[in-house]
């Protein structure tokens, strides 16, 4: 995406709408938003209404399109969870979007992917600083989040990809060469 014919999506010719997810702190109410019902100014934290679904996000995006006067989407593009949103666009509003570009996504999670997601969630919840979701924003559960992200990064790659990226064989050769040069 860029300005010019060499880009797959030329921003001179296309109107791009990029919408953040519901409950993300970057543009909508989220668990870190101040809860108006709490007199002490504390955030929603664990009291934030859940769950929020892919379909909920698409419905809000459609309302935004209506508000902007957009009558049709030429293309819905998304990576990972964004590809699930694009698929939901096609399922919920089939006459509203013409084309889909799905990057690293799926229409349905496998049992393995659901299990990985739960393990990641539990690693955050097991962090002593999580405190049932009522953690101190100045001292969040970083260790649990770091563990969750490590698990996620591994789950995004096939074993061969990890082997190529970290290439333990090369490291063993370096260690052997270092040991023989002493």
Enumerate the predicted regions with their spans.
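Alpha/beta-hydrolase-fold enzymes
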Residues: 96, 102-182
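Gly/Pro-rich cap/lid or specificity-loop segments adjacent to the active site
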Residues: 1-84, 91, 95-107, 112-118
